[in-house]
Amino acid sequence: MNGRVFQFEWDEVKANANVRKHSVSFELARTVFNDPQLLTVADLEHSENEERWFSIGYATNGSILSVVYLWSDADPAVTKIRLISARNAWQTEIRYYQEGL
């Protein structure tokens, strides 16, 4: 995502619930943003009250994760990313990622 500095944040209760539900920590999920092939699209289906984004990429443990988040680039030097959900990517998502769709 264009060489900017990322600042990550999340709700700890939500982060703990995400580990219980999907077995993926937000600490691991944040590493997908280092993937130069990161696939990102607007999450229009879940963007009723806020603009959500959906990315698929490799995490540092070698797994391909799907991550939902909000982001703000109000500061031109820093992109703030608020993680909402993270899980192992589904097979169809992995195929999209591999095909660069």
Listing of model-derived features with the role each one plays in the protein:
Residues M1-L101:
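Ribonuclease/tRNase effector modules and their secretory precursors
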